Amino acid sequence: MSTMNKEKLKGLQSFLKDDIWRVTEDEVSKSRGILYNAIKIATLSVREFTQGRILNKASALTYSTLLSIIPILAILFAIARGFGFSNLLETQFRSGLEGQSAAAETILGLIDSYLVHAKSGIFIGVGLVMLFWTILSLTYNIERTFNYIWQVKKPRTLYRKMTDYFSILLLLPLLIVLSSGLTIFMSTMVKNMEDFVLLAPLMKFLVRLVPFILTWAMFTGLFVFMPNTKVKLKYAIIPGIIAGTAFQAFQYLYIGSQIWVSRYNAIYGSFAAIPMFLLWAQISWGICLYGAELCYVAQNLRNYSFSKETANISRRYHDF
């Protein structure tokens, strides 16, 4: 029995390492072809993710995020105040730092101080320039990482960077408010429909699904928009769903860990949130970049040379 199991295991290893790469879609049924393609994409994406040292790129983006988080939040809150929904944005921000109220208040104080110094006194010009330059640097690093994954050598022009990136910053607070408003609306609907035995559970499920749908859309849009090349939407949807689901699952774990860490606030104070934020940023960027790798492999699957020596697969060609 043990010998048979070893033979089956060797056969499976041989199939995954060699045979599956020689199978074409015409030789198998449609469902089996989809399964084989999924296995190929998963295998190649993990290989490219590890061999390309993408986690090192995630660490670099974590460092850039740490330097840019206050300026970015300052811009978002400034835009929110301009539209008159800063209180709603603050509520969302505090809920994201559940269990770390001291850290949340410290960050909000830094944001207010940053905005005051950026628009007052003799340093108004320098402050605004530094504010926008910090944000532009982070978005440039994000684009450069996505271009690295997609093997794109030419970045966006400076004009396109400014127009594209600041359009995102303008839309982001609006999307946050839309998400909050939609969740509140559906929660109200659930309360009003408690007497409807069949519809109430469905509405509760939809309320819980809203954050996932918005996160899926966010990652899908990021995978399509951020690389400076043509990315087909159909190849970004499933990676967006996978990355978005992983991100939401990690968010639940992160919020739970924040509540646990809050017990140590008497010792560490608001500094207890710093290592947690670094961990959150590192894992979040890792999830995001793996999703981008999935998207790249899915779009370029046919251009890979599926030979016996799969380690020599070329990444130089793109399917547009």
Q: Which residue ranges define each predicted feature?
A:
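Membrane-embedded alpha-helices and immediately adjacent juxtamembrane helical segments
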Residues: 2-320
